[in-house]
Structure formats: C-alpha cells, structure tokens
Design a protein with these regions (language model features):
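Secondary-structure boundary elements
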Residues: 20-116, 122
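Solvent-exposed residues in well-ordered beta-strands and their adjoining turns
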Residues: 12, 164-165, 262-264
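Residues embedded in well-ordered secondary-structure elements
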Residues: 48, 150-152, 294
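Alpha-helical and coiled-coil interaction segments, frequently adjacent to or embedded
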Residues: 182-319
C-alpha cells in the first residue's frame, strides 16, 4: 500500500465500545447483505432506531461490514487512472458538481460494495443525509506508514466523515473500521474495528490530519502531527496510551528507547522488533512507566512495539 487511502496492514481488533451499541450492531447484522437501492436500507434503519446516534451507528456498522476495500481501484488511482476531474466557474457551480459526484460515488459504492476511502465516506454521507443527519466528507492525510514519521502532511490521500449529532460534530472512519490488507495473502479481509466510530478528536488526530484544519476538532499543528509515532489499529481499539516517548523519532545517541504505556492488562506480553536486528525481544513489564528497549548501537531504522503479537506503534531511529 502506498499513499492513497492506505489501509494499515495489520489486524484491527475491537472491544472498547461494544456495550454502547451492541443492540444496534446485533439488529443491523440481521439486515440483508444487499438491497435493490439505498432506500431499502434507509427504511429499515428509520423503522428500527429513533436516536440519531443509533441511526449513524447502524449506517456505520452496515457499511463497514459489507463494503470491501478495492485494491484494484486503489492501484489505478495511484497511477492516475479512474480519477474524475471537473471544472467550475464559481463556488456555487463547484458545490453542485461536488454534490453530484459524491451522490454518484455513493450509489456506485452501494451497488458494487467495493470502494476506496472516498467511496466509504461518500456512502456514509449519503445515507446519513437520507436519514436527516448532517454529514460531511473530510479530506486529509492518513498517517499509515513509518516513512511518514517526521513528514509534514501534504496532499490529501484519505477521506473520512464528520457527522453532526446532538449539537456537536463527531468523527468516523469507515475505511479503517472495515478491515485490513493481509500481508500474507495480499488481499483485503473484513475485520470490523469500532474504535473509529465517534473517536475522541484527541485520539483521532494521532493518525488523521484534515486538509481543512477546522475538522481537527482539537488543537494540533502539522509539525506536531508529523512528529508523532505511527499508531496502529490495536492501539485505538485496545485503548492503549503511550505517554513516552511523545516523539516518533528516537535519537541513536540515546542508545535506548524508554517506553511508558498505559492500558495493559495482567498477562499481556509486550515485545519489540528492531528493523536492523533479527527476531523479537520480550520487554520487562515490571515498571510500565519505564520499559527499557536497548537500541544496540542502531543508527537508523525502526522500532516496532507489539502487545500480544499485535502491532501497536512504531518509532523511527534518526538524528
């Protein structure tokens, strides 16, 4: 995966938010897998749920569990094939054409049940609006590869949604919730991750940076975003918190990485992998605020942190 709508290449597990929306999820899971048109899905959701947050959750659940990430389309977009470009004379014409484009993309996604990030976001927006809920597609940068550590976010490569619920904007990313690209099979596999539904903006910004900074819904500069480590899906779904180091770049002069992490449970195993060294090493968890990871004289490369064999975060070693 490269830069366009990259789905982080590891399993995204979910457990944190299950209780709040368990009943909604269970009901939506009994819905048909396909409909003749979106109105069929909208009608079911309208009949089953009254609260706007439940309606949005139902949309999110159905889209994330039925729309497959389209790796072929992603490859085409990366080389400039399949891009739709339109011209406009003024803002009014631009708004009209953008609305038409998003509606067409949403309908195409609904029928084919295949998409990259823009298709997921367009469908979430379209279905939410049909249910009377204000929703917007947000464009920006997804921090999804270790090479991005230290890089200022540039051209938009990802899309997600803002939905206006109970007087405030909430952030959701159905693309990251849908699943992952398996490194073993090099194909998409559904694996629902509910952590990206109504995520706290202070967490969401750890790997999302919008082109229009009003969609941060918090305070974070591009430089601060660039300096962050790379966080993976399990970091969010398991509600881990790395308190140190706050920077994603570790100096080789330190000759060690001192890790402080919250959220581990009794029996958890934390391992680390140094890109310039063979094999995994198990960390001593006697002091979770002071986990020492020796860098063994490394002057470059990456440190990957795993909990129970799931990757959590990566740091870069550089001056």
């Amino acid at each position: 995966m490269k830069t366009v709508c990259t789905v982080i290449l590891l399993v995204f597990y979910s457990s944190i938010f299950a209780q709040d929306y368990k009943a909604v999820d269970e009901k939506v899971d009994r819905y048909p897998g396909t409909f003749d048109n979106p109105n069929g899905l909208v009608t079911l959701i309208s009949a089953d749920f009254e609260r706007p947050e439940e309606k949005v959750r139902a949309v999110f659940r159905w889209v994330a569990t039925h729309v497959q990430y389209d790796m072929f389309l992603e490859a085409q977009v990366e080389v400039g094939i399949g891009l739709k470009v339109f011209s406009y004379k003024d803002q009014k014409e631009k708004d009209i054409k953008e609305k038409k484009f998003l509606e067409e993309l949403a309908l195409k996604t609904f029928v084919s049940q295949r998409a990259i990030c823009h298709g997921y976001a367009a469908l979430i927006e379209y279905l939410s609006l049909k249910l009377g809920i204000t929703a917007k597609t947000v464009l920006g940068t997804l921090k999804s590869s270790p090479e991005q550590i230290g890089m200022i976010p540039g051209k938009a490569d990802h899309a997600w949604n803002g939905v206006f619920i109970n007087g405030k904007w909430e952030l959701i990313d159905a693309t990251l919730a849908a699943g992952y690209i398996s490194e073993r099979t090099e194909s998409f596999e559904f694996h629902y991750n509910e952590a990206f539904f109504f995520m706290n903006p202070n967490r969401f910004v750890l790997n999302h940076y919008p082109t229009d900074e009003k969609w941060l819904l918090t305070q974070k500069s591009k430089k601060e975003f660039a300096d962050l480590p790379l966080f993976f899906g399990s970091y969010f779904s398991k509600n881990y918190r790395i308190n140190a180091p706050l920077s994603g770049t570790v100096s080789p002069a330190d000759n060690q990485l001192v890790l402080s992490i919250e959220g581990l449970e009794f029996g958890d195993v934390l391992q680390y992998f140094l890109s310039e060294r063979p094999g995994f090493e198990q960390a001593n968890l006697s002091d979770l605020s002071n986990i020492i990871i020796p860098l063994d004289g490394m002057h470059s490369g990456y440190v990957s942190i795993f909990v129970n064999k799931d990757i959590v975060a990566m740091f870069k070693i550089a001056e």
